[in-house]
């Protein structure tokens, strides 16, 4: 049987809590695009790491993309 996939945001949260005893910090800072198809921009940061930016069709989607980029940068994927 295959294990259920853990989403990037959850994976980053677990990593950050285990290593730093802190949650990742997400900052929503921009909404662009037309009203019917907005794009959201969010960044994420954990201690001792660079800030990664995620873009998505919702705030949640943007956070997932930012978390995935940071996990990728940290070679945790």
For every predicted segment, state its role.
Residues 1-77:
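Double-stranded RNA-binding/processing signature
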């Amino acid at each position: 049987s295959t294990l259920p996939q853990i989403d990037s945001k959850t994976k980053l949260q677990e990593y950050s809590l285990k290593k730093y005893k802190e949650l990742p910090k997400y900052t929503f800072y921009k909404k662009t695009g037309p009203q019917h198809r907005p794009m959201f921009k969010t960044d994420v940061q954990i201690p001792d790491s660079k800030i990664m930016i995620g873009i998505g069709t919702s705030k949640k989607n943007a956070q997932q993309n930012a978390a995935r980029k940071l996990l990728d940068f940290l070679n945790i994927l």
